Amino acid sequence: GSIRAPQWVKGGIALGPKPRSYKYTVNKKERRLAIKSLLSSKVLENELTVVDTFGFDSIKTKQMVNALTNLKVEGKTLVLLPEKNENVQKSARNIEGVKTSLVNTINVYDLLKYKNLVVTLDTVKKLEEVYA
């Protein structure tokens, strides 16, 4: 045999680590059902806040902090937007525990991770179209 066999000094490793993918896919119907049930549980537990719109003229973190405190939202918060709004997204990105996401990219993990959910009226309409 070889002098690099595993049983010898300076030999190879017998059963070394092998790369493994921990990726897990969920069926579309199951994912949609999970999102539906999470959204309804947020409504039942009063963790859903609906606002008319975020009318930010400029990118100011202070505006977003004031908006969230006026809504009496505390803790981890997910802000769902109907379409890309750079002013809102950049205003919220430096606030700890606040994440912005588009309505077409929501996932079960974020809905579970963030206690509060803040949505606009347009977002509610889009959610009703997709999940009603």
Question: Can you say where each PLM-predicted feature lies in the sequence?
Answer:
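Extended polybasic, low-complexity segments that bind anionic RNA or targeting/receptor surfaces
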Residues: 16-132
